[in-house]
Amino acid sequence: MVGGEASAAVEKLVSGVRQAADFAEQFRSYSESEKQWKARMEFILRHLPDYRDPPDGGGRLDQLLSLSMVWANHLFLGCSYNKDLLDKVMEMADGIEVEDLPQFTTRSELMRKHQS
């Protein structure tokens, strides 16, 4: 019977992961590539328990979605933001593996090369 209990526990876990992924899917942007979405969905799902909206509202989920966009925009599009905000989202994303990220050159780097 122990095997049956373990199997039921695994099925419950898989079902929960599926439900969470289905829930997150509604927040995918039309313009996001599969790679961008997978990374951002991992960011969202990782922090979803801490950002669930309280019964009286409060916008915690909106805050999480905004933070996920800041992180994705910085990573994939090279957008820059306030240092404190970037520090926060980079800390939140610690451990999320993203391969083949684009490389960006800042204006300052271009100016230094031009002056050399």
Swiss-Prot record:
In-chain residues carrying the UniProt-annotated modification N-acetylmethionine: M1
Database matches in InterPro entries: XTBD
Ranges for domain XRN2-binding (XTBD): 24-116
Signal peptide: none
Keywords, sorted A to Z: Acetylation
Any Pfam family matching the protein: XTBD
Keyword Plastid listed: no
Similarity comment: Belongs to the CARF family.
Subunit structure, interactors included: Interacts with XRN2; the interaction is direct.
Protein name according to UniProt: CDKN2AIP N-terminal-like protein
Organism: Mus musculus (Mouse)
Gene of this entry: Cdkn2aipnl
